[in-house]
Curated annotation (Swiss-Prot):
Protein name: Integration host factor subunit beta
Gene: ihfB
Keywords: DNA recombination, DNA-binding, Transcription, Transcription regulation, Translation regulation
Self-association and partners: Heterodimer of an alpha and a beta chain.
Lineage: Bacteria, Pseudomonadati, Pseudomonadota, Gammaproteobacteria, Enterobacterales
InterPro entries reported in the protein's UniProt record: Hist_DNA-bd, Histone-like_DNA-bd_CS, IHF-like_DNA-bd_dom_sf, IHF_beta
Amino acid sequence: MTKSELIERLAGQQSHIPAKVVEDAVKEMLEHMATTLSEGERIEIRGFGSFSLHYRAPRTGRNPKTGDKVELEGKYVPHFKPGKELRDRANIYGG
């Protein structure tokens, strides 16, 4: 599901709220989450999951075209850990 599909689905379910208001709310929520993570804070949504930053240590990688070694710097990457309720719902679908 893309962001546009999410906005469209939410707007369809909440017909009393203009689509532009739904779009602005989704964009604001995602922006706030990105800002929170960029400040090093963790986001926890009970029953859904948590977002945090994980550190990837510096390492030697390879250029896929040439095979040459490339030194990669350490960096922080976003990480999502699903909550138990979400895992259970996913298992119902997948099982």
